[in-house]
């Protein structure tokens, strides 16, 4: 399965890869310096330098794989439906409470700030729906509910939602 990403997501990931590649020499130097301290079995600096290098390399591999397997999506869509980077005001019927969420790509989610993925149960239920639509959200056999889309706002500040670190 491909991850749906915007061209902006891919450009930011490529930029991060370039920055992380520039850090490689520094990690190598840290390892060489730590090795010079002697016995590696009890050398915390050496193990920390290796851990930092490996974490950097893992992030580079992850980002390259995300780019390689990405399906580039077009952010343009029907102006009257929920799309990527829209702020959506929802009425949760069972609680009679309103909540605002922003629908995003997988690389920019942050549930603590109300930024949800299109692939999430709520995101997939409201995606491409219109104001006034009553939508069924199926989280699991035990958790199901209805929401009503009250308002859709185009979020011109989607660039402020950073790429997730992990």
Where are these predicted regions, by residue range?
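Residue-level signal for pocket-adjacent positions within structured domains
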Residues: 35, 67-68, 111, 117
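Conserved, well-folded catalytic cores of nucleic-acid-processing
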Residues: 20-23, 30, 34, 63-70, ...
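N-terminal cationic and glycine-rich segments that engage phosphates or anionic surfaces
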Residues: 1-58, 159-166
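Internal alpha/beta loop-helix hairpins
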Residues: 47-80
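Non-DNA-binding regulatory cores of transcription-related proteins
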Residues: 73-156
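Flexible domain-boundary/linker segments
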Residues: 30, 48, 63-66, 80, ...
């Amino acid at each position: 399965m491909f991850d749906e990403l915007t061209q902006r997501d891919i450009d930011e990931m490529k930029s991060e890869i370039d920055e992380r590649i520039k850090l490689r020499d520094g990690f190598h130097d840290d390892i060489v310096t730590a090795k010079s301290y002697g016995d590696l079995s009890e050398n915390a600096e050496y193990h920390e330098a290796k851990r930092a290098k490996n974490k950097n390399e893992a992030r580079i591999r992850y980002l390259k794989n995300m780019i390689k397997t990405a399906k580039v999506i077009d952010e343009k869509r029907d102006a009257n439906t929920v799309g990527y980077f829209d702020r959506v005001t929802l009425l949760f019927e069972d609680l009679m409470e309103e909540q605002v969420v922003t629908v995003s790509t997988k690389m920019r989610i942050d549930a603590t700030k109300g930024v949800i993925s299109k692939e999430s149960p709520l995101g997939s239920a409201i995606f491409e729906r219109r104001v006034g639509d009553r939508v069924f959200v199926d989280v699991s056999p035990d958790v199901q509910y209805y929401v009503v889309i009250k308002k859709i706002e185009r979020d011109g500040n989607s660039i402020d939602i950073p790429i997730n670190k992990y």
